[in-house]
A protein has these predicted regions:
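Cytoplasmic helix-loop-helix junction between adjacent transmembrane helices
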Residues: 111-146
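Helix-to-loop junctions at the C-terminal end of transmembrane segments
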Residues: 66-78, 161, 272-285, 369
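Symmetry-related core transmembrane helices of the 12-TM Major Facilitator Superfamily/SLC fold
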Residues: 169-185, 378-393
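Juxtamembrane intracellular "pre-TM" segments in multi-pass secondary transporters
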Residues: 2-14, 187-227
């Protein structure tokens, strides 16, 4: 899968190979940390479930608060420089976790890594947002590079965890981020992605920024889209966690077996975005979004009837295809609505919104799993996904130029 057909220029119509590889490495490292940290908290630190949850919540809160600031930075400063420095900070956080089994140091590592990740991902998405003006495939390509990390980095890391333990696994994640930082820095020397460049966002008037009127207006303009993103993201996160709980507690699968069940969906999520973008170009956003909403709802509803891991794996592919269609369209619509001078701020708000949705979805999943039958929990998630997905085209149509909606 060649995501970067132009091997040299990061600011041309496509991303450079160095940029793509760095995205894959940092994405895979982040997925490793997300998978391993809860296990590490219980097995090595001896934390209770509530304490482990609090540790994760503090990290997520840090990321949530810093992502809008990352958007401000991405609009004012060199985005590749921000991404490279943030990748190094992310790696430093993983090094702290790998180096010791004492809670204060691990907490510091979690906070440092979440801070680095907040600035990193906003800068990377803002780079894609700037590319979107000359290459509408930019967000689909970025998503493919991200999801490639799930089976290029995460799958070997699970094997490393089983063979060598937690510290080497976190060290490997740190190595991935440090290599990514070097790749980003080297691509910065070869091709600038400056916020005030021809392709990237222009800098805003500092006097206007000081008043904050434009930022507040941007938030108000994007509020309907961000609200729908929150609804869909909450339902998707809820059904994802519900499924993991079901596989673990009802079907008795171990973490490695759960990873194998999710692998076909992960591969689909990495491969599908550019192909689904072609369908979006051919048929328009509205038909693709409606089809994706139906596919996502079919995944959630079908889980109520699925009784074996093979069927669940097939259904997981439906969910992956839905996300591969919806997420690049959401990000592209947000970029178009924000305008070139506010790409970073808009995507900072978007990143914070998706993080909030993930937190709400996790909370909802826990409540649904304990309070209602499995079939009712799946049906509830399916209904929310379908309604949110059907609302999304109308919300996007109100934001974007008519020719971009289709």
């Amino acid at each position: 899968m060649n995501l970067a057909q132009d091997p040299s220029e990061a600011d041309g119509p496509t991303f450079s190979r160095r940029f793509v590889r760095s995205v894959t490495l940092v994405s895979g490292a982040g997925q490793v940390a997300d998978f391993v940290l809860p296990l590490f908290a219980g097995a090595v630190l001896g934390l209770t479930a509530a304490q482990a949850g609090a540790l994760l919540a503090v990290g997520l809160a840090t990321s949530f608060l810093l992502r809008p600031l990352g958007g401000v930075a991405a609009d004012r400063y060199e985005r590749t420089t921000i991404a490279a420095a943030s990748a190094l900070v992310l790696g430093a956080g993983y090094v702290l976790v790998a180096a010791t089994a004492t809670f204060p140091v691990v907490l510091a590592g979690v906070l440092v890594s979440r801070a680095g990740g907040a600035f990193l991902w906003v800068a990377l998405r803002a780079t894609a947002g700037a590319r979107h003006q000359v290459d509408p495939r930019a967000f689909a390509r970025l998503m493919s590079a991200e999801e490639l990390g799930a089976w290029v980095v995460l799958a070997p890391a699970i094997a490393l965890l089983a063979a060598a333990g937690y510290a080497p696994t976190f060290a490997a994640a740190a190595a991935c981020t440090l290599i990514a930082g070097v790749l980003l820095a080297s691509s910065r020397r070869r091709a600038s992605t400056r916020g005030s460049g021809d392709v990237d966002a222009a800098r805003a008037d500092p006097l206007v920024e000081a008043r904050g009127a434009v930022v507040r207006g941007l938030a108000a303009r994007l509020r309907p889209l961000l609200a729908v993103v929150t609804v869909i993201g909450t339902a998707e996160a809820a059904v994802g966690l519900l499924l993991v709980l079901h596989l673990q507690r009802e079907l008795g699968l171990e973490p490695l077996a759960i990873a194998w069940v999710s692998l076909p969906g992960g591969i689909a999520l990495a491969v599908a975005p550019p192909h689904l973008h072609r369908l979006t170009v051919r048929y328009g956003r509205t038909p693709v979004l409606v089809a994706a909403a139906i596919a996502g709802a079919a995944f959630a509803g079908g889980l109520a009837l699925a009784r074996d891991p093979m069927t669940i794996a097939v259904l997981w592919i439906l969910s992956a295809l839905a996300l591969a269609a919806i997420l690049p369209i959401e990000q592209a619509a947000l970029t178009e609505a924000a305008g070139p001078a506010r790409i970073g701020r808009a995507l900072g708000l978007y990143e914070a919104t998706t993080l909030l949705a993930a937190a709400l979805g996790s909370l909802a999943a826990g409540i649904l799993y304990d309070a209602v039958p499995w079939a009712a929990a799946c049906a509830t998630s399916a209904a929310v996904i379908l309604v949110g997905g059907l609302l999304l085209p109308q919300v996007i149509r109100q934001l974007a130029p008519m020719q971009a909606v289709g």
